[in-house]
């Protein structure tokens, strides 16, 4: 949806109003009714901005961004078309994540304090502003602090590239800088607490970008294979119909059908019933397998840290613990090796109906 350009005075008024409700009243002792009304108005701000691709900024930008930021183009008007299309794609999955507070997000890949560079800071304001930053479900969200109830800005990571950027600063923190850049969207510059922390942010974002770009590849390959198989079957049936139909002036000939091939392997595994449990040499029943603990890898995953478990697509992994579920990680076992695995890379291996 094309965003409607608002007059500059209205943009700043709406932005100041939203900022006062979100930050100015955050620690005030409000009555329950006032708190509900404050939350209701803030949700209305976010829903309208998302629905109409509005930023309440005369210069465009990302959803709910800082008042000191501006658009890559530096001109007045709505956000770039590509930015609006990105948000319209994400809205199909809902806007719940965009409205959540810093402590309410799930599937968090990386979070922590960073200094974010402002595109157009005020005379008395700092060029670098401290923000609580979170990567979750393909989104990069930044908050005023780790207890904020709504983000000051949000953007989709897909379509960006990330790199270390020591050229952003001239002081002692220059080796701790990194940036996200795109050809048709605004760029984002950050400073971490240390060079090692900055490299970890770059590595995590790079891994996520690689994962997002490869999500459609397996589906496309399987779809092409299915289309080829359907085409071959259709040609075979057409040949059979041609021999069955009567032809004038000719005698029907017997068609030599191909020999039946061996029975194709069933792609589903047959689970044993409780009555089929075998007995060992001592006559005792073997321990019953809990199939609900087994998950299958959706994609290849190469662990970057010693405590991360590496696996390939299709590997059968036994989940030992979901203690770190809130961080998006489980504890799994593969080939007697134990490590943490990203839960978004797994799917249930067995159907539990009738077990």
From Swiss-Prot:
Give the region (Disordered) as residue ranges: 64-83, 219-252
What is stated about domains?
A: The SH3 domain interacts with FYB1.
- GO BP annotations listed: adaptive immune response; positive regulation of adaptive immune response; positive regulation of cell adhesion; positive regulation of cell-cell adhesion mediated by integrin; positive regulation of cell-matrix adhesion; positive regulation of heterotypic cell-cell adhesion; positive regulation of integrin activation; positive regulation of leukocyte cell-cell adhesion
Residues forming the PH domain are 107-210
Record carries keyword Ribonucleoprotein: no
Q: Which family does it belong to?
A: Belongs to the SKAP family.
Q: Which PROSITE patterns does the entry link to? A: PH_DOMAIN, SH3
InterPro entries attached here? PH-like_dom_sf (IPR011993), PH_domain (IPR001849), SH3-like_dom_sf (IPR036028), SH3_domain (IPR001452), SKAP1_SH3 (IPR035765), SKAP_fam (IPR037781)
Give the sites modified to Phosphotyrosine.
142, 237, 268, 291
PTM info = Phosphorylated on tyrosines. Phosphorylation by FYN on Tyr-268 is required for GRB2 interaction. Phosphorylation by FYN on Tyr-291 abolishes interaction with FYB1. Tyr-237 is dephosphorylated by PTPRC.
- Top-level taxon in the UniProt lineage: Eukaryota
Instruction: Return the Acidic residues bias intervals.
Output: 219-242
Q: How does it assemble?
A: Homodimer. Interacts with FYN. Interacts with PTPRC. Interacts with GRB2 when phosphorylated on Tyr-268. Interacts with FYB1, which is required for SKAP2 protein stability. Part of a complex consisting of SKAP1, FYB1 and CLNK. Interacts with RASGRP1. Interacts with FYB2.
Give the source lineage, highest ranks first: Eukaryota, Metazoa, Chordata, Craniata, Vertebrata
Where is the stretch described as Interaction with FYB1? 286-291
Q: What does the UniProt entry say about where the protein is found?
A: Cytoplasm; Nucleus; Cell membrane
* The protein's name in its UniProt record: Src kinase-associated phosphoprotein 1
- The keyword Cytoplasm is annotated on this UniProt entry: yes
């Amino acid at each position: 949806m094309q965003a409607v350009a608002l007059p500059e005075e209205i943009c700043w008024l709406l932005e100041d109003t939203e900022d006062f409700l979100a930050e100015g009243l955050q620690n005030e002792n409000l009555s329950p009714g006032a708190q509900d009304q404050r939350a209701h108005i803030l949700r209305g701000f976010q829903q309208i901005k998302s629905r109409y691709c509005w930023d309440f900024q005369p210069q465009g930008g990302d959803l709910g961004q800082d008042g000191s930021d501006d658009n890559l183009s530096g001109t007045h008007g709505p956000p770039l078309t590509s930015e609006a299309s990105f948000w319209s794609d994400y809205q199909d999955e809902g806007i719940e994540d965009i409205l959540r507070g810093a402590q309410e997000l799930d599937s968090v890949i990386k979070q922590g304090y960073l200094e974010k560079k402002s595109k157009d800071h005020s005379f008395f304001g700092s060029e670098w502003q401290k923000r609580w930053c979170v990567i979750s479900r393909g989104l990069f969200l930044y908050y005023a602090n780790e207890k904020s109830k709504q983000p000051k800005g949000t953007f989709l990571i897909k379509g960006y590239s990330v790199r270390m950027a020591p050229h952003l600063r001239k002081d002692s923190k220059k080796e701790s800088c990194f940036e996200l850049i795109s050809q048709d969207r605004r760029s984002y510059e950050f400073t971490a607490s240390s060079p090692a922390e900055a490299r970890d942010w770059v590595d995590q974002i790079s891994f996520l970008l690689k994962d997002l770009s490869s999500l459609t590849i397996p589906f496309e390959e399987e779809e092409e294979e299915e289309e080829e198989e359907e085409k071959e079957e259709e040609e075979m049936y057409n040949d059979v119909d041609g021999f069955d139909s009567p032809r004038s002036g000719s005698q029907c000939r017997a068609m030599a059908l191909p020999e039946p091939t061996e029975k194709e392997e069933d792609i589903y595994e047959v689970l044993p019933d409780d009555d089929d449990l075998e007995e060992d040499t001592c006559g005792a029943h073997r321990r019953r397998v809990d199939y609900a603990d087994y998950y299958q890898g959706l994609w290849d995953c190469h662990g970057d840290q010693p405590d991360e478990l590496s696996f390939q697509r299709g590997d059968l992994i036994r989940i030992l613990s979901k203690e770190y579920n809130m961080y998006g990680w489980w504890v799994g076992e593969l080939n007697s090796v134990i490590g943490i695995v990203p839960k978004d890379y797994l799917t249930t291996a067995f159907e539990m109906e009738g077990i």
